[in-house]
């Protein structure tokens, strides 16, 4: 079996008490068949740190983006986004998007920043990693306005209903599910996971957040992707092996990666 964690934040894991270092995290992951990890940046400063942190590890892929929580005051950060995203180690643009849950006061700034990421994605032909919280209508509208058919991407840790999923799927986007799908009360997410076609699903941990059952209350890590995979496979009446094969194919296709990645287990 070969699994890929399509979204996590490796630098935020607890390296004081839980892990001895990044290699320790990767070793634990491989024991659970998680062989490739996409670690996601949330700011330009964070991207520069991650570039050094992953130390050229072939099993760890990297994105470049500015999370809506970290809107830069300096416009030069936007120029840096475009410059650094062109780095050959970068396979995706983001994490970007809209988050109205914590901050309603800067909607316009979030939207401007999101549009810049979309334009960068189209220019560089690298997929978007999209964050949307309490903002699905604006997210969809902006993607349409920016001619998103020229770019591709994934809605990460998706928690919206089937209607929103259908619109995004018709626009060509992929849908990624995190440990939230394993929560007993996440009925909407369960139904959406059943609905999304198997050739358009990705899976993720969003480590160190959103630990799946049975690890709720414990810091999340890429190894726990295995449990999320098992849960969704059961929801879709698929064998874990077939589900793992298809989600890995989906990841490689979306991020335009060669199949030799699957020989790195």
UniProtKB/Swiss-Prot annotation:
It comes from the Bacteria. Its cofactor is a divalent metal cation. Keywords: Hydrolase, Metal-binding. A divalent metal cation 2 binds at residues 95, 131, 156. PROSITE patterns: TATD_1 (PS01137), TATD_3 (PS01091). Its EC number is 3.1.-.-. One of its GO terms (molecular function) is metal ion binding. Belongs to the metallo-dependent hydrolases superfamily. TatD-type hydrolase family. This is Uncharacterized metal-dependent hydrolase bbp_325. It comes from Buchnera aphidicola subsp. Baizongia pistaciae (strain Bp).
